Amino acid sequence: MNKLIAPFFIIISLFITACNSDDNENEPMSPFSLEKTYYEVRLWRSITEIPITNGSGDISLSVADETIIEANKVQNEGGSTYVALQGKQKGTTTLTLTDNVTGDKETVEVKVTDCYIAYGIAESNHPTLTSNLMLYLVNNKARDCYFFTMDNMRHQLNNTPLAEGTYEFFVKQNGEETVPYLRLSYSADPSGNFAQNAPMEIHDFALSFSDSQAVLEIIKSYLDVDWVELISNATTKSVPPRDYTMILTVPETDYEIIGAFATASIPEYILN
């Protein structure tokens, strides 16, 4: 009797497996679509990702102007797929993504902006540059900078900058000590607070670092700042981990701002 039961269960299990396989094959594939049709990528120094979350995952890419961006399909070890965009020169072009199985197409506009870097303030007793403020320094001829606040309800930056200004890095010689400075120019009222209709004022901040080599390298790389006097002894070796903390102090005051550089993206439609 037992000899008859065992083959019976084997046949049943094979039948169920075959049915499940047929069900998976007959399950309709979700159409291919994207959440956004507009993307920005900074010039050369970073990659913007377009996540592929539906469709077959078998995607073909066609860039209208390959002198502006480079686009590549990337598949992670976990199986997730995305398109990596890298900016080659400033400008705007389109990228068409085609699902080779479903035939669905999506065309997105891609804008390459000036390179920039973010400085996020973690702690501060400064009246204007307060904690949770994000400062973006742009690598353009004007040396523009933008100040953004956080939308705590949505846990993201507000889309419109709180203020705009310009920046400059320079060095002061204090006896035998060389001190780097960041000069920020922005409109401020008599108390030093941001004010749109007020005249531009210059604010100088002395800089200190937890890891001077790492910070000076990232500033030089993203903003083309020449720190010859400060990095003359820097090596080209990788020294992990790297700490991008930078401390700003206002000379002859007790104001101290502690933050760190990051490659966080600026809200869209801000930069040219």
Protein language model features and the residues they cover:
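Sec-dependent signal peptide recognition
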Residues: 2-10
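C-terminal motif of bacterial Sec signal peptides marking the signal peptidase cleavage site
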Residues: 15-18
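Extracytoplasmic soluble-region selector
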Residues: 20-271
